[in-house]
Every structure is written in structure tokens, then in C-alpha cells.
Amino acid sequence: PLSSYFKLYPFVVYDNKQVVGRFGITVYPNDVTAYLGFYECIDRDAVAKVIFEEAEKFAGELGCERMEGPVDASFWIKYRLKINLFDRLPYTGEPYNKEYYLKQFTDNGFRISQHYTSNFYEPLAAENEDSLYDNRLAMFTEKGYEIKSPDIKDYDVVLGQLYKLLTELYSDFPIYKDLSEEDFRKVFNSYRYILNLTMVKMAYFKEQPVGFLVSVPDYGNKVYHLDNPMNLLKILKLKKKPKQYVMLYMGVDQSHRGLGKALAGSIMEELRKNGLPSIGALARDGKVTQKYGEDYIDQLYEYVLLEKNVTKIYKREG
């Protein structure tokens, strides 16, 4: 549903008829940035050099002034480069790549422009109450806020509420691009089949949606291979009995300061009940969500976004 928003140019690199790398260049109307993504390369500096030189040359021929990556076509698909904890299996929603890719990017003129973290939290004991988050939840409840999990019969309504909140609150994120509500629904409609709605929270004030926190059971990369019947069975099993949860999306209307900790408190209540570990996924440096539950953080995943100006010799004249 997103292909109408951009133009994607795919490339494959061969050495003696053997595939040694691939990449894609994505461009958007009225945007001077070329987005480099779908990056794969063997561990050979010479091959990486060819990829980045060809990518920059092509971006320049298109009239672009800079490159940013890795971005697999869209903010709504996948972006960022993983840079640590490669001994751990990928969690759902995690960008995953070879450990040496960072060096290949930086050796070829890219610099880190954004840094992100994911927090891995150990299970919360049932008796382990947290006064900060519990008190914040109680305080907002007393003020008339309602924080609750949606009912599956209301999924379509809640999806519309999420669209309005998420597209407004995420609009200042790097590489963010708008999309229509119709296409948003196409992207997120299938989530109804993988969510446990007890771990999805919506916040309302005077019956208006003002915040959200969306968690999914950790399916690893199985949700990307739904054509495999065995994966479908594993997904159904994990949905019924998750091993951990991934908190993928969170946002609060800026006129309701402090509500984020109340939303976090409502999820902590659920985590105390189920006794499962969790991951607070992909928070950008400077965002308050990076610090949520910091007393319970066991490990810290790190990711980056990189950029490079297109060299003058590659730029299209006029």
C-alpha cells in the first residue's frame, strides 16, 4: 500500500556471477534526500566501496543532495542500523543486520545522525510495586482520565484514533513521511491477529483519545514469514503463551504532560500479572521514554541512522 508514495530503484552487485551485495535507493517527491536501504554486503571492503560509490553517483544523478540510511523505502517499513548485542535473537520490529555494516557505512563517508536505544526489562515480580508509576496512574485516574485496553470489536475505531494521534505525534521524527488513513489501515489492519489487547492501552480524557501504548508478543521474525504454515502455528502458540513483550509504539498528546508515566504504569500492572520480560523498543535519544523504568533495565540495545552529503562531482547540474 505504500509504493505509491515513493520511487524505489533496486541494485544487485555481482562478482564473477556471484551475488556479493545489494541495495536500494528510494526517493520521494519534493525531497532532496536519497534513502539508502535494503543493504546487504559480504564482509569485503572493496565490495562495500563499490556499493556506496554507485549509490552516491546514482543519488547525484537523480538530483539529490544527501543520502540517509539504512532506510528500507519508508519510515513505516524499516529503518536504523543495529550496532550491538548481536548475540541475541532479533525481536519483533527490530532492525537486524550484520555486525560489520556500521564500519562499512562509516568507512565510506557516512556519519551518525541519530542514535536510538531499546531497553530490555527483566520480569517484574507481582509484589514489586513502583510508587512513581503507580502513583502517576492513580493521579490521572482521579483527574478523570480513562486508561484501558480496547475491545476487539472496537478495533477499527481505535485504529482511526491511533492514526490521528500517531501521525501527529511522530511527524517530527527523522525520515517521517505522511500517509493517508486508508493506507495506514492497510498497514496496521493485520495487527489485530497478533496483538494481545490486554497489552495495548489507550488513554482518554473527556472521551477524547490523548495517548496510546502498543505492545506485541515477541514473535521474533516469524511474523515476516506468514506464508510458512509452521510459522503460523508458532505465532498462534506464542500469542497464546508469549515469552516476552515488545512495546513498539507510544505517544501522548503534548497538552497532557505526565500521562506517559501513567500509561507505563498501566502496562507495568499487566507485566506484574504475567511475570514476563519486556522490551521498550527504539526510543530516540532525548525522548523521555528512554528513561522509563530505568531501575529495571537489564540490557541496552543500540541503533543508529546515518547520513552523507552527495559529493559535488556526482550532483546533477541545473
PLM features: what roles do these ranges have?
Residues 1-23, 28-35, 41-42, 46, ...:
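Catalytic cores of nucleotide-enabled group-transfer and carboxylate-activating enzymes in metabolic
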Residues 15, 27-29, 40-43, 71-73, ...:
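Short, flexible loop/turn elements at secondary-structure junctions
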Residues 1-31, 149-250:
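A conserved beta-strand-loop-helix scaffold within acyl/acetyltransferase catalytic domains
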Residues 10, 22, 33, 64-70, ...:
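Beta-sheet entry/capping signal
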Residues 31-109, 229-295:
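Acyl-donor binding region in acyl/amide transferases
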Residues 75-77, 186, 209-211, 218-224, ...:
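Flexible loop/turn segments at secondary-structure boundaries
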Residues 120-136, 300-318:
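C-terminal "cap" of GNAT-fold acetyltransferases
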Residues 95-173:
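Acyltransferase donor/substrate-recognition loop-hinge adjacent to the catalytic core
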